[in-house]
Amino acid sequence: MLTKDLDIYLVGGAVRDRLIAERAGQDTDVSTSDRDWVVVGATAQQLLDRGFAQIGKDFPVFLHPDSKEEYALARTERKRGSGHKGFDVDANSGVTLTEDLSRRDLTINAIAQGADGQLIDPHGGEADIAARCLRHVSDAFVEDPLRVFRVARFAAQLPGFEVAPETQVLLTNMCDGRELVTLSAERVWQEFVKALAAPEPHRFFEVLQSCHGLSDWLPECSALPLDRLALHRPDPLARFALLPLNADDVQALAERLLAPKAFVQAAMDRMSYLSLLSDWPRVDATALLRALEQLKALHDTQRLVLLMQLMDSPALRQRIEGELLPMLDDLKAVVLPADRAATLMGPGFGEALMEVRVQYLDERLAAL
């Protein structure tokens, strides 16, 4: 056993989520959830000798060779510069579990569980779980500006949890002090996407709005009506597409956050085609075919399916799935007669093919 004789503790989200589930009367199996471990009294070389693989070079975090779970040496951190990465890390074998837990962001994330199942909770995290409170562990919280976005994301991830008043003061001070501009777009995007997948994504924006945290990275999302996002399935791509933004705002937001092109495409498709497709049985056949071609739906239905999932009406989604999608296969089979195709070249061929497919589609729509 690779962890034999190591002093290890389960920490972070697995412990937090189990305690939350227990309070809600839900069953949870910590062994099957995402788990992180802290190792006390060991060195990096000891873990390497056991076959663990170190992740990166800045932090003493290692992957278990079999489970691929993360094992981190107990460590302390000291601020030495601005931004998310400006820390000196001390992971010597003398760092205690209590010291390690003291560097964490929120009390609910600063609970450890020993091999005997006992909880080590020096900062009252279990009480804050009972009170549904997001509270910082110490004043060192302000040393990492990414924590502003993490707190907002936890508000979205954990329904009913509210930010403690004293933590709200720190968040506002960090935002007003322009600490957020030191973050990388990649880290902000990661928190943004996690929030979009959370049960209450609108809470992410509400918390950031309340602490002046939208202006540097998400100004387009200020004062938007976003509570409807939670009505749709927890897919970040779909929920990004549903943000009530115009094309210019989508482009600006995506460029600032270095968002993947698929997210921009989904938002643009929503603006261009969702209304038309929501009324597809009554749409002019030419307009419908042009939309389907623009979506490349005759070759790949991925973009069309995403638009279908954005629709509020289950009946409409079912009708697209049951009637329009199968119709695409038939539409692809509509081609020009060989003798006519042989006489056409260039744009003329495309126009003629469009004509026969519009005629076919018009007949199919009339028969619905």
Which ranges hold each PLM region?
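Catalytic cores of the polymerase beta-like nucleotidyltransferase superfamily
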Residues: 1-368
